[in-house]
Amino acid sequence: IQMIFQDPYSSLNPRMLVKDIIKEPLDINTDLSTIEKNEKVNWLLDKVGLSSEQATRYPHEFSGGQRQRIGIARSLATEPEIIIADEPVSALDVSIQAQIINLMMDLQEEFNLSIIFIAHDLSVVKHISDRIGVMYNGELVEINKTDDIFDNPSHDYTKELLRAIPQPDPTGREERKKERLSIN
């Protein structure tokens, strides 16, 4: 199991080079030679869309999206079966969010990963998830296939979350307003 954190800057040691950040889990958990570790670091950088030339830079020299790619590369270093991604795109611009989400989905398929994707943005959750668990007050209150959660939620809190999603279509606005008022 590995982790991808919400804030890529605070989760990366600012005094370490990118290559050392990605290599650290390999130093701790593998018996690879130095050459093999360096080759794997370069391979991981390539997998997340960064170049091996960037390995000798520090985290502050990268954008938020690039730093998140470094965090993703670090999480893949030990070839985990499961990655816990805690709000991995919430601190990023919308255009960068899409790139990171698509990268994670590609890596999930390529490496046969299970990703526990923790998020508040239901549009992101719907896009990336096969199954969704809904938490309320620290308790898992509903878990189901993504389509079932969105089409036929069973828990009241899940229903309330789905009703809170902004709807760009103004034609149904009055109906949704009546529905919200009938709950209260």
Question: Residue locations for each model-derived region?
Answer:
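A short, proline-enriched helix->beta-strand linker immediately N-terminal to the Walker B motif
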Residues: 77-81
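Conserved ABC ATPase "signature" region
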Residues: 35-53, 162-163
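Conserved ABC ATPase signature
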Residues: 58-62, 66
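Hydrophobic anchor residue at the start of the ABC signature
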Residues: 72, 100
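Short catalytic/signature loops enriched in Gly
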Residues: 145-184
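A short, surface-exposed alpha-helical micro-motif characterized by mixed small hydrophobic
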Residues: 125-127
